Amino acid sequence: MNIDNTQRRFAVMGNNTFTIANRLMTDQKICRLLKYQTKDPFKSIDPITGNKQPDVDGIDLIHKQILIVPKVFDDSTEKMSYIVSVFDDFTVDQLNPDFKISTVRFDIACPYDEWILNEQSLRPYLIMERIDQLFNGQPL
């Protein structure tokens, strides 16, 4: 077995990072929660302002609100919510030394005045819930 192509080497982490980013940017719930800083980001029209809220092209959020490096986009002049994904806590699998076991950590930041969506929902927790549905127990 060519050990350079196994999960034991950090070289595969780049591919895994892009797999995570792709899964996030293709999910409309995540994209809408990040893009639309409104009380109901899931509606096609904001009920308060009447502005259209079309589906979001997730590629526009990469390196701005969906981050694969632990640094927030510098040029932003507007309030935005962010997701940063990083790998953490690496250990070699004792049963299969060709694999490293790690934790994928998602850091979520939202402007304080955009947390409350309605009487029952908080934006960062809805983002966490959706990330959990997309990744918990799922292979990359």
Regions from the language model: what does each represent?
Residues I20, L24, S85, F106, ...:
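Generic low-polarity alpha-helical segments
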Residues Q94-D98, Q120:
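Short histidine-centered beta-strand/loop micro-motifs
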Residues D98-E114, I131:
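Oligomerization/assembly interface segments of phage tail-like spikes and tubes
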Residues F90, P111, N136:
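Residue-level marker of positions within ordered structural domains that often coincide
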Residues D4-T6, W115-R123:
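Short, flexible/disordered intra-domain loops and linkers
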Residues M1-D93:
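Small/polar-rich, solvent-exposed N-terminal microdomains that initiate assembly or binding
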Residues S76-T77, L122-L140:
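Acidic-leaning, charged glycine-interspersed low-complexity segments
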